[in-house]
Amino acid sequence: MSEHNQDLRFLISDDVLNEDPMSTGRFAEEDRGSSDTEQLTDNKNDGEEPKETAVQAAFDGSDDVNRLEEPHNPVSSTANIGNFALLESSSAEVSDASCPATMPILVRQSPKTCSQPRTRKVKLSTLSLSSDPDPDINDPEFKARLEDSNQDDQDEELDLEMEEADSAGRESGEGNRDSEDEGLLADADLPIEVLLRRYGYPVPEGEGAVNGEPEQSESKGREQAAPTSTVSETLPSTKLSLAQPANQTDQSLTDTALPEPRVPEQLIISGKRQRRKKEIWTPDDSEPQHLVGKKRIKKVEIVEKVEADVHQNGDGLVIVEEETMGDEDNDDSKVGQEEEDGHEYDSEEEYDEDEDEEEEGAKEDNVDWDDRQDKEGDIGPRVRQPFLLRGTLRPYQQAGLEWLASLWSNNMNGILADEMGLGKTIQTIALLGHLACDKGVWGQHLIIVPTSVILNWEMEFKKFLPGMKVLTYYGNQKERKEKRVGWHTENTWQVCITSYQIVLADQHIFRRKNWCYMILDEAHNIKNFRSQRWQTLLGFKAQRRLLLTGTPLQNNLMELWSLLYFLMPGGIGADATAVVGFANHKEFMEWFSNPMDKAIETGDAMDEETLETVAKLHTLLRPFILRRLKSEVETQLPGKFEHVVYCRLSKRQRFLYDEFMSRASTHEALTTGGYLGVMNTLMQLRKVCNHPDLFEMRPVKTSFAMDNVARDFEPSDILIRKRLLAEEDERRIDALAIGFGVAHNEAMSGWVARARQTYDASDKLPYAASPLRRGKLSAPPPKDTRSVELWLKYRVWAEEEFSKRRWESIRATNRQRCGISPIYGSTFLSLLGNLPNFLLPQDVQSRREETFADFTPPAAKFITSLPERAKSLEDVIDRFAVIPPNAVARNLATYALPGLEPISHPALTDPAFDTLHRSSVKLQIAFPDASLLQYDCGKLQKLFEMLRDLKSEGHRVLIFTQMTRVLDILEMFLSHNGHRYLRLDGSTKIEDRQVLTERFNSDSRIFVFIASSRSGGVGINLTGADTVFFYDSDWNPSMDRQCMDRAHRIGQTREVHIYRFVSSHTVEENMLRKAEQKRLLDKMVIQEGGFNNDWWGRVGWKDMFGDVPGITDVSGVVEKSGEGIIDIQVEGTPVAEDVEVTRPRAGEERELARALAEVEDEEDAQAARMAQGEGELDLQEFEEGPKAVAKRVRVFEPENSGTPVTTEAGETGDVVEEYDDEPGSVEEYMLKWVEEDWDYFSPYRA
């Protein structure tokens, strides 16, 4: 064997160069496809040789194993040159001194990038010529993914068959002619020039032998080289694309010379390479090296080594040839190099053209990850879902995870800008789980979020990734100090969640740590690069940075520049994009911001230069921003369908609507009232459309109370007193004392009653029969006390009269008692109660009467009490006794007998005594019928019909409204129809919102959830419902969009139908048209790079309705009937929320704010203020310094709120001007508006 054979060395995988210096001395070789992976220990003196080796070569017959290790040096060790890495061979790599110590080695770079530094074992073996040939040369390329659970056993059987075949060949003396070792041994003695010409590569000029000895070519090792770290500067290189002519190819090394695979079709695994016994190399550790039906592609670049950081003692080059696969994705540099060289492969060795086109298309638009995943479905996802993650990611979320993992692998930062509701939080959590499970990177990570969603993030971590230790860093200074106990202890926590305010307050603490990942939620608020917050966060030490936002593109592109510079403070080098000097603020403004802002503000159509600028901007942003809309993933999310429901006004609504419009005050307000008058009119008309009770309540009718007419006549007192005092004897008789009761004498027998009447002796009493006297009655003696005789005479007469009246009273009482008789009598009732005794057979012994005492007598049911009679007539009273008299007067006896006091005996004040109270009250007060609540409103009539059908079909409903009083009416409506519901309004506490939403989502018995559109959107997820009703539209369309997203978001499994109620032929129909016009106008404004088209020059406000595609003129549909359901087109892109060109000027804003504050109800204004307060609580974290105090009271419409917050004049001492005096001419009108807006524009005059 020649000396060159002994000096032949093999290039070890580039993973050695990416080893962590802290992990020196620890080796591990992972093989996830097999359970019996071989491992080598650190003990170099261990004499035990592993059964199988990862890399085998034939040298001098020795079986020594060289285990090499090299620390990580991403700058000085490697350099990216297209698809190759230039490595420096040193004595640490190859211990044999016969090989040049400074021999540069050119290595082809694998498609994947090293994602995480790891310490790996490297095994180098030398075998004699008589050693066993490598059986891996016969491994087939797997075509399909194995789904059988016995995959390992089948692979083991296949390996055994291949080894037996090789052993049989060696015993026969033939050996394995296709072995890599055989080919290497045959080419070992040839010079490098001969090898290059033999395999079809041109020899570079001036390059020949190295140090007088020919260079050696490395064998096609079974360990595929891993990618190396990129360098910060591009190395100047001489790039030669070397093709392989067909006539010079060694046919013994082509795939056609390989034997037919012996593996059954069902055992083929796509994307994996079967190694040897119990060894399967998975895609996570190495790239597959063979494809069934694919030709091996040999491509070598020869590049001069000029890197200053790499120590170089010679000019030699070692060319390493590696195999690539047609099915695997190549990196961007490879595709670009092939396109630049213009190389075309021969028919036998070129890629499949269709697959190349798909790969290049995916690289040109890396945003469409779903399509790319579909094309790569044969090889499966490149990043597996972390095993610690609970639940299953959706396909587009899996694509987002792969994109985030690729950012980590490529040492890049990025912006995840998915639309709200697509799960940016869960994708971020999955990324951290992937780093922990697959990369061994457990943190520590820093997540900065708004204050209102800190607990939401913590709940999401506990729900989906409970294996992570999460620290929620918030509270006062003392609480935060307690939470910092063990701050620097390893594995105390892996993720720290805090807010923007706290991270600034404790920046000296956060700045000391070296964070693994720094993630900013709602990062679109960090857009002012001059702010202290932006500069503070920029100074934090973090390996990677990730921004989460739903609106990455704001009003101007300079805000986007702030985000991109935050990700890449050092600018973008030539290895990432063609734009050099990106970090230059001035140049970026000149290149992109100024042309785009000019095109948008002027409304002119974009010229070719501007469109080219937009294309360059898109090219710049694609590698760093991932943006998916719901319309793009609608195949994975349930569909969303919007409908407009036109409702007819009821008779009462139409009467009130027409009556209000015909008022003179209404005409005056519309003509001379300004904004305040117009807004007041609109609000009143909207109240009529929502429900007439909001405009005018149905009255509760009562009788007219008046004094009694008889009181005005003086003789009435005398006549009443004479009538009441006429029968003195009867008046003094107590009815109860004499037994004058209807039902009090039923215990008396009829025999006793008749006996009393027979033996009545009332006429036998004294003075019973008074003798008739003729003539005049003698006058009573005078009461004269002047003489004894006259006094005694008067006294005798008085005693006689008293005795006479006493006997008359006794006689009348006795006659009354003897004359009473029962209605039925005890004899009759006893006869009825004992009636069953007569029906008994003669041979049955008669039972005691006490036995039947427990039974109700049959006649008792005919005798009902007053409460029972009142209850039986309750339905009649409720239905018909509803008309009170027109007028009532007080009782005359109250005025006739002023000295009498009302009776207040406890027995009379008992509610059971007054059985006719309900009927008497209804005769006095007439309440509106409960059913009129529904029949007075056309919207409620339509809602009743739709809810009835939806409930029968098993749907669940959300009802949103702007007005709080409408929620009260909806509560009465739902209670009247028997629907179970929950209510959420602006007065609901933030901590109670989560409880209500979870109860609704978990309890399917709750049919309806009614909520105010201003109840706040933080933490509200109502995916339990699949139908959304907008009873009325909010002033701010963004509030309605948030309400839609509460049901149509992650977790929704059914299609969502959205119904918007509109009263036909009213002001609501015009408001809907204006909303559609604004939606289409906003759709044309900076949406996902849509700076295209010349709509800006030809679309106007009038043309947008009817002429613009997407708007249907529904006026003719509801012209005759006045009702119906119209389907509208769901917008494919979200409406821009912050657009300067659509915002009104300051004067209009102030007028609108004042008008809404005046005309809205106090409950609605309070709900709006609370919702605005929640928004301001988050926005305060992004405000920089105190605002300048204006000289006048400024009133602005806040973002995402229907009602603006008005400033009271008393707070600042200013006086808000009134607009009672209207200008008399156009000039005065213009001057008035200019004077009002002068203070607003004064800061911009300079």
Swiss-Prot record:
InterPro entries: Helicase_ATP-bd, Helicase_C-like, INO80/SWR1_helicase, P-loop_NTPase, SNF2-like_sf, SNF2/RAD54-like_C, SNF2_N. Pfam families: Helicase_C, SNF2-rel_dom. GO terms for cellular component: Swr1 complex. It catalyses: ATP + H2O = ADP + phosphate + H(+). Residues 149-166, 320-331, 338-362 have a biased composition (Acidic residues). Residues 27-52, 167-178, 363-381 have a biased composition (Basic and acidic residues). One of its GO terms (molecular function) is histone binding. Residues 939-1092 form the Helicase C-terminal domain. Catalytic component of the SWR1 complex which mediates the ATP-dependent exchange of histone H2A for the H2A variant HZT1 leading to transcriptional regulation of selected genes by chromatin remodeling. This is Helicase SWR1.
